Curated annotation (Swiss-Prot):
GO terms for biological process: prolyl-tRNA aminoacylation. CDD domains: ProRS-INS, ProRS_anticodon_short, ProRS_core_prok. The gene is proS. This is Proline--tRNA ligase. HAMAP family: Pro_tRNA_synth_type1. GO terms for molecular function: aminoacyl-tRNA deacylase activity; ATP binding; proline-tRNA ligase activity.
Amino acid sequence: MRVTRFPLSTTRETPADAEIVSHQLMLRAGMIRRLSSGLYTWLPLGLRVLQKVERIVREEMNRAGALEVLMPAVQPAELWQESGRWEKYGPELLRIRDRHDREGCFGPTHEEVITDLFRREIRSYRQLPVNYYQIQTKFRDEIRPRFGVMRAREFLMKDAYSFHLDDDDLRAEYQRMHEAYCRIFQRTGLAFRPVEADTGAIGGSVSHEFMVLADSGEDAIAVCEASGYAANVELAPAVAPTEPRPAPQAERAEVATPGQRTIAEVAAYLGLPEARNLKTLLVEGADGGLVALLLRGDHELNELKAEKHPAVKAPLTFAEAERVERQLGCPFGSLGPVGLTGVTLIADHAAAHLADFACGANREGYHLTGVNWGRDLPEPETADLREVTAGDPSPDGEGTLTLRRGIEVGHIFQLGTTYSEAMGASVLDEQGQERTVTMGCYGIGVSRVVAAAIEQNHDDRGICWPAPIAPFQVALVAIKAEDPAVAEAAEALYADLTASGIDVLYDDRDARPGVKFADMELIGIPHRVVVSPRAIQEGSVEYKGRQDADPTHVPRAEIVTWLKNRLT
């Protein structure tokens, strides 16, 4: 492809509204252009990358035995009402009405549609298992679209759905999909980790996220390098202390702490480490009362864990200060469990292991020190309520945890019968009896993979594409193209490279060398070959890898073979 026929829409300035590197570089490289909030047009350069990711996904899904279909983007409300998700899904579901006043929605996902297709088409256990997939545009009405295509309202997704007679067969297919996903992300050239994850709004019992590792990642993941354990911090269990709780050494005392509001302030004022301070968080209870969640001062509440506790109202709702002061007669900033009546107390395992700790005294400007369980207040109900921290024991008992940042690009679920029961998806088994099928679903954010690849692979000059998904394999640059000898040599090399099946972008513009080099580095083509008057005299060309420090001179007669060896 010639640049004169493939206009580059590169810019030198970083757009002011682009917050993360991938958004900045996709705009600067001319890969995408914003149409409206969360809506983007993919330009030819960006589309080439998107299509390469899509091709890898399609090849591996086909290899794993999945069958490609294409379902409508607009879905009737009746299916969502039948599954029970019409009201549950929330405002991210863009609801519409047609001219006949029929309700529908733009699909953010397709569990209902595929389950409806299955119950119409598949009748016998002999037709199982079956796994359908599609690569299609989705729409989720994000309240604050940001980060370019990383969190857009419209995006390209591969979603697959499998149907099985029993859970054993589902688990086998789930493992096949897990392996297929690993091959997909290996082929894209990305560093990634599969991690245990929460099932969220999709539902089901077991799920894994596939995380591209990047410092800018929105998600925190807990990893044990010794054992290979990995989980989203939302799900990672915090191991309870195993050693005996220390015996009390101090007497309880009430201490004035004027103006000290935060854990850090109180700890510094009292001369105690934050780990020996107890924080009390009041939330709405499932029975309409209040629940006090008690954590060590240096630990953070894991809201997902708290929300799953049967005593806690879902979704998790923190108590309003007005209600606390009215019902308990004490200010928000001085709460503590001692003498707190009419409130259910639930302590994190680590908090229940404290001795001689400090906590709020339930009156303004005062805290208690030397507090001990069993002496100053009853032994609490305990639960895992906190987020894991670096250095915690790994839940699998091998080694310790480190925390990494990741970008979710894939998510797979064992759905079970969540949708098939609600929608009556069944088959006749070997005995001729109706049997509800069990399901799995498997998603990849295809457009999100592109942004994640940039977040992981860039420098101060631009994108450094992994070779399998680069828009072009080789950039051919002619220096002093107005020189007939240079033009002739560059044209001949372009023809040779193209004939050899190499995907090449030939910069035949009448532009300064610095402009050409800067553009090729910005758009991230992995290999650059330069034809210049000096190189012609030497019978060579100049080669430079995108991340090489210095160029290499390669004989002209050998460059095609030399490149092909590096591309395989």
